[in-house]
Every structure is written in C-alpha cells, then in structure tokens.
Amino acid sequence: MSLSNSLGLLGRKVGMMRLFTDDGDAVPVTVVDVSDNRVTQVKTQENDGYVALQVTFGARKASRVSKPEAGHLAKAGVQAGEIIQEFRVSADTAAQYQAGASVAITSVFSVGQKVDVQGTSIGKGYAGTIKRHNMRSQRASHGNSRSHNVPGSIGMAQDPGRVFPGKRMTGHLGDATRTTQNLDLIRIDEARQLLLIKGAIPGSKGGFVTVRPAVRSQAAKGAN
C-alpha cells in the first residue's frame, strides 16, 4: 500500500550517472527504469471496500507463477510481472484506468517535482555497533587494550540486572525496506521510459523500487 493516496510507478534501479547544467554544475542522478507499468486490477469501494490500483512491473516466466496468480492475471489479460503492488488512489483516478491498461510516465510525474523512492537497502550482513549505529571508537592507546572498537558497557549491575529492550548492539545490517523522501525529478526519458532522479536511492543495481509523488514535500531553503 502506498504512503499516500496517489498513483506511483514500479521500477528497477539501473545505476547512477551525472548530468551537467547550463552553468556547468554536475548533478548526480539515479536512473530508474519504469517501463511497462500495467494495471492488473482496479479495486472499488463497492466491491473491495477501498479504492486502489494494482500495478505490476517486469516479466516473469509462466512456470514461476502460482496458479491463483496466473488466473488473476489471465482475467485481466496481463502478462505476469516480477512484482505487484497496490496504490491507494482517489475514485476519479481509478476511473481513468481499467485492467490491462498501461500507466504512462507523464500521467504520473513531471520534471521538477519532488518524489519519494522506496526500495530494499543493500545487505551488509552481521555488523558491529560502530558500523551499524555510527558509534564512536574508544581510545587507540593510553591504557586501552583490545577494546578499541567494542561498544563498552551495555547496562548496570544488580539493579536492574538486565539489558533494557532496544539497546543498540551488534546485529544484522541492511536488507530492509527504506524510503528516501523529497528527491528532485531532474529528467524524464519518455522514449526509453526512464526517470532521472537527483541523488541516491535505496538498494543495489537491479533492485526493485517504488517511485511516488512526495508525501510531504519541503519548501525550498530561504523561502518565506
């Protein structure tokens, strides 16, 4: 489900590059492939209790599709995609689409607007407190022996006699759903169906992402 009642697009992170402005400034951008977003189901208040558009992206082999999902997609006349996601939308927006229809980039986004990008962050495996929580190392010398990159004390003694829940400690880092908000959409390549978004987005190359209009766009610095 989307974070807001607005339609977005599913895509794949291609990688990063840079563009140059007319003044010669380099702008780092992430390229996102949002080609062939298609509607698999239109959910209505009368039939489903809420209004939403179910969208799929990519292509998947028929042998990799479960029978219930295959029947659902066959009813809509849509090829099986790699991911399926719902977007809560208004009734007016839902009325513009029907199952099997493609979602055009320009019908959702325009150059210069703010967008939110959601993806799965790169997995780092088991990490220590310094890398995982950005803690500071202990002293390199002056009496410190073999305790340079350890977290130190994690609690007290007999009272309370336990480690409080939520204590920041070592553990698995990354491979989690993360959202980067208020990124500038620098350019739209309609021919190749690409979005060029300023800055970095979660995930590795080839990872799936969701791009939607910004939920809470910030005003420019210095604006009254």
Curated annotation (Swiss-Prot):
Name the GO cellular-component terms: cytosolic large ribosomal subunit
Keyword entries, A-Z: Methylation, Ribonucleoprotein, Ribosomal protein, RNA-binding, rRNA-binding
Q: Which GO terms describe its biological process?
A: translation
RNA-binding listed as a keyword: yes
Q: Which residues are modified to N5-methylglutamine?
A: Q158
What the entry lists under Gene3D superfamilies is as follows: 3.30.160.810, Translation factors
Q: Which GO terms describe its molecular function?
A: rRNA binding; structural constituent of ribosome
Region labeled Disordered — which residues?
Answer: 134-159
In this chain, composition skew of type Polar residues spans: 137-150
Changes after translation = Methylated by PrmB.
Disulphide linkage map: none
Q: Which residues cross the membrane?
A: none
What InterPro entries does this protein map onto? Ribosomal_uL3, Ribosomal_uL3_bac/org-type, Ribosomal_uL3_CS, Transl_B-barrel_sf
Question: What is known about what this protein does?
Answer: One of the primary rRNA binding proteins, it binds directly near the 3'-end of the 23S rRNA, where it nucleates assembly of the 50S subunit.
Record-stated family: Belongs to the universal ribosomal protein uL3 family.
Q: How does it assemble?
A: Part of the 50S ribosomal subunit. Forms a cluster with proteins L14 and L19.
The record, for NCBIfam families, names:
L3_bact (TIGR03625)
- The name this protein goes by in its record: Large ribosomal subunit protein uL3
The organism of origin for this protein = Verminephrobacter eiseniae (strain EF01-2)
